[in-house]
Amino acid sequence: MSEVEYRCFVGGLAWATGDAELERTFSQFGEVIDSKIINDRETGRSRGFGFVTFKDEKSMKDAIDEMNGKELDGRTITVNEAQSRGGGGGGGRGGGGYGGRGGGGYGGGGGGYGDRRGGGGYGSGGGGRGGGGYGSGGGGYGGGGGRRDGGGYGGGDGGYGGGSGGGGW
């Protein structure tokens, strides 16, 4: 396999969208080498995002240009260039990509999925799943301190089930 991968991050997917549908939707832009919806390790349920890998750069860029902000299965999706797993990103912490902290990542602006340092996170702040999202405010998916030690699913600043702080899963 070549060192360069032309991979898109696709966020905001409906829970029902599967790998085959993702591939079918994006294959109109060029040859799709791989398409994968990311599932929760514990529940096996879609986490609402995935990746599509194209054979060439033009196909990837066309897909990003045409599909970012478009609707798929009733949801407005986000499509951008995925950060590579190696090197400069340091495991997705620098400037976007899955779990990235600065300026992007799933859930938008400053904070990745369940990031313990607050500011962004899964569906919070000004991005992700419709503005407020699960963790709402400055909390993220698990409230201020990630899933295990801050607010938990219903904690944080508002959160899915109201309440503030405490809780956890």
From Swiss-Prot:
Q: Report the residue ranges that make up the RRM domain in this protein.
A: 6-84
Top-level taxon of the source organism: Eukaryota
Q: In which tissues is it expressed?
A: Expressed only in roots and stems.
Which key words tag this protein in UniProt? RNA-binding
Is the keyword RNA-binding in the record? Answer: yes
For this UniProt entry, the molecular function terms from Gene Ontology, in alphabetical order, are: RNA binding
Q: Which InterPro entries match?
A: Nucleotide-bd_a/b_plait_sf, RBD_domain_sf, RRM2_NsCP33-like, RRM_dom, SLIRP/GR-RBP-like
GO annotation terms (biological process): RNA metabolic process
Q: Where is the composition biased (Gly residues)?
A: 85-101
Chain segments carrying region Disordered:
80-101, 121-169
Reply yes or no: does the keyword RNA-binding apply. yes
Q: What does this protein do?
A: Possibly has a role in RNA transcription or processing during stress.
Instruction: Give the protein name, as stated in the record.
Output: Glycine-rich RNA-binding protein 10
Its gene is GRP10
